């Protein structure tokens, strides 16, 4: 969603461990010389509107100083490949500031996202 956040180490560790156990989740990490420069977190699920399985990018982030180098595109293309192996008919993503990035990769704007903090 192109927002800044601060990772709480304990929460990250438990969430990451749980994600690694899930069949419907995928995490990619982009590294350069041992440094993490980006990541993608995605899932898939069944949906009526897609008449089957949909994969969605929950989070995609690339370090500001590494943007424009194809890192995000490479991770997104790899995610699309995973989605195909899962028989997904669509890949979806919500974004606020990266619309031009997704449009350049043939994604189309289809909805407005709402949220409610619980």
Where are these regions (language model features)?
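Alpha-helical elements of Rossmann-like donor-binding domains used by nucleotide-donor carbohydrate transfer enzymes
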Residues: 14-15, 35, 74, 78, ...
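Residue-level detection of beta-strand scaffold positions
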Residues: 1, 62, 79-83, 88-89
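Conserved residues at the C-terminal ends of beta-strands
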Residues: 43, 63, 94
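Conserved acetyl-CoA binding element of GNAT-fold acetyltransferases
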Residues: 52-64, 112-115
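Acetyl-CoA-dependent GNAT
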Residues: 1-51, 58, 117
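Conserved active-site alpha-helix within GNAT-family acetyltransferase domains
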Residues: 73, 85, 89-91, 95-118
